[in-house]
């Protein structure tokens, strides 16, 4: 039987020297099982790690949101805008510290009561603490009810007003004066300060009656500085810089001895109106005396215009407004000569009150001298002439002409010799220009060369002569006469 079974070949034992020089490439392909598993799950490992990190962040955000909801409302109102995570953590830490201090204080009270010692505070103080704690609990419950059922948010104006009112009422009974100072910024704009003042008044009276004042009564601090000095000080709360500092300093220095000062505040002109110009000095040339030309002009203007200083200043003002002010005075409430309302007529002075010889030097580039004498001034007049209208007596017109001549002499000293002609020429000019109703009885009245006594500016215009119309129009000075 044994012969029919083939015998297995005997295993040949290999020694170490048989392996030398052989290359076993298949051995390099073999890897350990642990490293093979790590390589295969390398891509699948990142996904669970991301999920774990997301879950961790979600848990952190959820805890911060719960802390935000558990924070008291007065801590939430200390910040503006959205509460960040860091702000929520800071407020939570602050609240925990306050609770820890309160817990430690209550623990000390309990120990003191167990040892049989007297209370650290007076009975009134203990009652106030109990009342304050109950008030906070009730206020918190009210806010939670409004937030849940009425959908109120802490940022709504009505919720802020309610919180301020509750806080103001609670601060009236606070035990320490340090917490009383928090009432001012929170209860501004409500009726809490007046209520606090009314509640503190009887408290101060009771403290004055007793020898030992109460701890929750705070005396009112009053300013000892006078109200006038307070009004004169610069207001540093305003940043406009328009408090009238330059005007207030001289008044304050003058009023220190008398005990009163007046503040002058700079004001803007109303609307778009420009401020009124400053008046010129009336005694610039005459020195206030009637000896010089300026003094004579001032006396003549004062005699003419009476109590109207503005018209007198306009007469003596040596600028471009002099001529425009001399063209027409009257016609209204400021008429120099009071007349009845029915007979009131405008009193006009001529525009060209200079003699032709003096005016020709100024208007020579625009008008010819002959044209000037022909159309603007009669040839016989060598002095300023008055213009008379019905309703104005001759003495008044003569006084007005004298005032105009004096004003012109004061404004233009170089022309004083021209404006003061000899008496015979002045008499001839007056006889030439005076109408028959006001002329002297013995003086002859010659016919006016142009036939118009009330309009010295208008001359005869020929319909077919364009040159005469160009010369007699003083509004076109650019056209020269041939």
From Swiss-Prot:
Q: What are its GO biological-process terms?
A: circadian regulation of gene expression; negative regulation of DNA-templated transcription; negative regulation of myotube differentiation; negative regulation of transcription by competitive promoter binding; negative regulation of transcription by RNA polymerase II; regulation of neurogenesis
Which Pfam family is one of this chain's hits? Answer: HLH
Q: What is the effect of changing residue 362 to H?
A: Affects sleep duration; abolishes inhibition of CLOCK-BMAL1 and NPAS2/BMAL1 transactivation activities
Compartment list: Nucleus
- Where is there biased composition of kind Basic and acidic residues? 246-256
CDD domains for this protein: bHLH-O_DEC2
Record keywords, A-Z: Biological rhythms, DNA-binding, Isopeptide bond, Nucleus, Repressor, Transcription, Transcription regulation, Ubl conjugation
Tell me yes or no: is Repressor among this UniProt entry's keywords. Answer: yes
* Domain Orange residue range list: 131-166
Where does the record put the Glycyl lysine isopeptide (Lys-Gly) (interchain with G-Cter in SUMO2) cross-link? 31, 121, 210, 266
Which region ranges are annotated with the description Disordered?
228-298, 438-482
Tell me, what does this protein do in biology?
Transcriptional repressor involved in the regulation of the circadian rhythm by negatively regulating the activity of the clock genes and clock-controlled genes. Acts as the negative limb of a novel autoregulatory feedback loop (DEC loop) which differs from the one formed by the PER and CRY transcriptional repressors (PER/CRY loop). Both these loops are interlocked as it represses the expression of PER1 and in turn is repressed by PER1/2 and CRY1/2.
Q: What is this protein called?
A: Class E basic helix-loop-helix protein 41
Q: Which organism is it from?
A: Homo sapiens
Q: Which gene encodes it?
A: BHLHE41
């Amino acid at each position: 039987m044994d012969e029919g079974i083939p015998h297995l070949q005997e295993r040949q034992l290999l020694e170490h020297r048989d392996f030398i020089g052989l290359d076993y490439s298949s051995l390099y392909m073999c890897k350990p099982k642990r490293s093979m598993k790590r390589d295969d799950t390398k891509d699948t490992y990142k996904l669970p790690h991301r999920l774990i990190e997301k879950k961790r962040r979600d848990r952190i955000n959820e805890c911060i949101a719960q802390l935000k909801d558990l924070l008291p409302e007065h801590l939430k109102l200390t910040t503006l805008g959205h509460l960040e995570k860091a702000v929520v953590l800071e407020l939570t830490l602050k609240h925990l510290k306050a609770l820890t201090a309160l817990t430690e204080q209550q623990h000390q009270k309990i120990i003191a009561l167990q040892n049989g010692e007297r209370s650290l505070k007076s009975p009134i103080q203990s009652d106030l603490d109990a009342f304050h704690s109950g008030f906070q609990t009730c206020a918190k419950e009210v806010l939670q009810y409004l937030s849940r059922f009425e959908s109120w948010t802490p940022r709504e104006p009505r919720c802020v007003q309610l919180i301020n009112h509750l806080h103001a009422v609670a601060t009236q009974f606070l035990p320490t004066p340090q917490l009383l100072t928090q009432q001012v910024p929170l209860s501004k704009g409500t009726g809490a300060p007046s209520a606090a003042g009314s509640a503190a008044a009887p408290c101060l009276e009771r403290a004055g009656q007793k020898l030992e004042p109460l701890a929750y009564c705070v005396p009112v601090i009053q300013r000892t500085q006078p109200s006038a000095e307070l009004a004169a000080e610069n207001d540093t709360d305003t940043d406009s810089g328009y408090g009238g500092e330059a005007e207030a300093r001289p008044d304050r220095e003058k009023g220190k001895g008398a005990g009163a000062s007046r503040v002058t505040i700079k004001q803007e002109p109303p609307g778009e109106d420009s401020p009124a110009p400053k008046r010129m000095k009336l005694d610039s040339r005459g020195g206030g005396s009637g000896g010089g030309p300026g003094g004579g002009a001032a006396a003549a203007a004062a005699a003419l215009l009476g109590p109207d200083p503005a018209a007198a200043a306009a007469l003596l003002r040596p600028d471009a407004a002099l001529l425009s002010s001399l063209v027409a005075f009257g016609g209204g409430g400021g008429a120099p000569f009071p007349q009845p309302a029915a007979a009131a007529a405008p009193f006009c002075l001529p525009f060209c009150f200079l003699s032709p010889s003096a005016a020709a030097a100024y208007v020579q580039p625009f008008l010819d001298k002959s044209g000037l004498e022909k159309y603007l001034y009669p040839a016989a007049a060598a002095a300023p002439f008055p213009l008379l209208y019905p309703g104005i007596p001759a003495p008044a017109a003569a006084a007005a002409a004298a005032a105009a001549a004096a004003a012109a002499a004061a404004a233009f000293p170089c022309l004083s010799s021209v404006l003061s002609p000899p008496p015979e020429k002045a008499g001839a000019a007056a006889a030439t220009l005076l109408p028959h109703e006001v002329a002297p009885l013995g003086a002859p009245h010659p016919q006016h060369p142009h036939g118009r006594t009330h309009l010295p500016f208008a001359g005869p215009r020929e319909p077919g002569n364009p040159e005469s119309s160009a010369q007699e129009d003083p509004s076109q000075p650019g056209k020269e006469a041939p």
